[in-house]
Amino acid sequence: MNPNRNYYPQDTFFRQALDRRYRTASIWQALFLSALLIAIISLTALLYNVVDGAFGFVAYEYKKDPATFTSKPLNELTKDDLLVILKDNLSSGAYTKLDNEQPMASRSQADLYSLFLERLVQIDTKDTWSMTDSILRGAEIRAEVAEKYPDAKLEFRSWLTPQFLVSPMSSRAEFAGVRTAVLGSLWLVGIAILFALPIGTGAAVYLQEYAPKNWLTKIIQTNINNLAGVPSIVYGMLGLAIFVRVMEPLTSGSLFGVMDSNGRTILSAGLTMGLLILPLIIINVQEAIKAVPDSLRQAAYALGATRWQTVWHHVLPNALPGILTGSILALSRALGETAPLIIVGASTFISVDPSGPFSKFTALPIQIYQWTTRAQSEFHAIAAGAIIVLMVLLLTLNTTAILMRNRFQRKY
C-alpha cells in the first residue's frame, strides 16, 4: 500500500455526496409529513361532516294546535299537567299500552312532554338544514321558511340531546333515540368477549408455549392469520348456518322454556361476533406472549417451576397489558360491524329494549344504516347524531385500552 496515496474522498466529491443525502432525506421527510397532513385533513373532514349534520335549523308545524289541549304555555306544563292531558285525550287502549310499557306516573317530565308532542300535538317537520347552512345562510333560510311554510316555526336544534340517548326507536325522527340500539350493541360485545376471550387466550397460549413447531402447527397458524382477514359477511353466513339454524334450540331459548323466539336472537349475533374477533384475539395474545422476555421462562424453569406454573405465574401476568389492549381493540371492530348482524337477523326497526340473550335486537350501526336510507332529511340528521354516539363509544374503548396498557405495563 502506498503511504503517500490519499484514500479519502476529495472535498468536492464528499460535499456533493453529503448534499445528495440531505436532499434525499428532505424529500422523504416532506412525503411523510404530507401523508400525515392528508390523514389529519381526511379525519377532520369526516368529523366535520358528521357534526355538521347533527346541528342546524329545523322548520316544523303542529298538526293540532296545543291550545286545544291546554291553555298554559308549553314551557310551563308540569308533570301532573301532562299526565292529566294524556289521560284525557289518548284513547284508553293507547294509554293502557303506554302504561304497560312503563308506568305513566314513573315517567319523567321530559318523557311525558315527548309523548304529548308525538301522540297529541303531532309535530310535522317540514325541512332541515345543516349547521354550516344555518350559520352562513340564516337570513335566507328564514325568508324561505316564511314564504313556503307561513305557519311553521324555525329553531336551531341539536339532534344529539340527552333525550336522544334515552329514547327508543320511533317512526318519527323528532322522537327517535338510540337507547335500544346502544343496549343491543352492549349486549353483543359482552357476549362476544365472553365467548372469544377465553377461547382465544387458551388457543394462543397452547400455540405459543406448548405446540411443537411442526408442519401442522404452521398450517394452523397460517389459517388463523387468513381468518383474521376474511370479510365479515362470511362470518355472518357461518353464524346463520350454525347458530341460527343448527343450534336453534339453544340460541332461541326453547331449551330453557322460552317459546316466543327463534334462532335470530342476540345470543346468535353475539356468538357470531365472537367468531369474527376470535382470530384477532388469538393473534394479539400470541404477540403479547412473544413480547415476554425468554429469560423469565428460563429463570422459572431453573427454580423448578413446571411449564404450567411458568405460564400462569410469569408469562400471562407480563403479557396482560398486550392481551387487554388487543382484546379491547378487537371489540372496537365488533362494535362497528353491520353485515354479519343483518344476515343473522338483526331488526332494522324495534322499540323494545333487549332484556336477555334470547331477545330480538338491533345495533347502533344498523340503526345508522336504517336512518341514512330514509328519504326524509330529519332522519339523516339523527343518523349524524347516532354516528357521534358510536364514535364516542369507540373512542371510549380505545382510551380504555391505552389506560389499561399503561396501568399494567411492566418495563424490563
Task: Enumerate the language-model features and the residues they cover.
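Transmembrane alpha-helix signature in integral membrane proteins
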Residues: 38, 176-205, 327
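Transmembrane alpha-helices
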Residues: 284, 293, 307-345
